[in-house]
């Protein structure tokens, strides 16, 4: 059986925690930051956990994580 391929785009965007969950960056912190409050930008800088309904799709894209 051939080796499974990793989706490289997903590999750059997701990391796996020690418990097997996936983390992701939050959106809206790339540009147009001038009008956003400091508190909002700080909250957006933290990593988020991928929703459980999306975990299966992410794990299929990353077979070796």
Curated annotation (Swiss-Prot):
<comment type="similarity">
    <text>Belongs to the bacterial ribosomal protein bL35 family.</text>
</comment>
<keyword id="KW-0689">Ribosomal protein</keyword>
<dbReference type="InterPro" id="IPR037229">
    <property type="entry name" value="Ribosomal_bL35_sf"/>
</dbReference>
<protein>
    <recommendedName>
        <fullName>Large ribosomal subunit protein bL35</fullName>
    </recommendedName>
</protein>
<dbReference type="GO" id="GO:0003735">
    <property type="term" value="F:structural constituent of ribosome"/>
</dbReference>
<dbReference type="InterPro" id="IPR018265">
    <property type="entry name" value="Ribosomal_bL35_CS"/>
</dbReference>
<dbReference type="InterPro" id="IPR021137">
    <property type="entry name" value="Ribosomal_bL35-like"/>
</dbReference>
<dbReference type="GO" id="GO:0022625">
    <property type="term" value="C:cytosolic large ribosomal subunit"/>
</dbReference>
<feature type="compositionally biased region" description="Basic residues">
    <location>
        <begin position="1"/>
        <end position="15"/>
    </location>
</feature>
<dbReference type="Pfam" id="PF01632">
    <property type="entry name" value="Ribosomal_L35p"/>
</dbReference>
<dbReference type="InterPro" id="IPR001706">
    <property type="entry name" value="Ribosomal_bL35"/>
</dbReference>
<feature type="region of interest" description="Disordered">
    <location>
        <begin position="1"/>
        <end position="28"/>
    </location>
</feature>
<dbReference type="GO" id="GO:0006412">
    <property type="term" value="P:translation"/>
</dbReference>
<keyword id="KW-0687">Ribonucleoprotein</keyword>
């Amino acid at each position: 059986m051939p080796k499974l391929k990793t989706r490289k785009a997903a590999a750059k965007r997701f990391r796996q925690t020690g418990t097997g969950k996936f983390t992701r960056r939050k959106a809206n912190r790339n540009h147009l930051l001038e009008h956003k409050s400091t508190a909002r930008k700080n909250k957006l800088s933290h990593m988020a956990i991928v929703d459980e309904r999306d975990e299966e799709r992410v794990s299929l894209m990353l077979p070796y994580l």
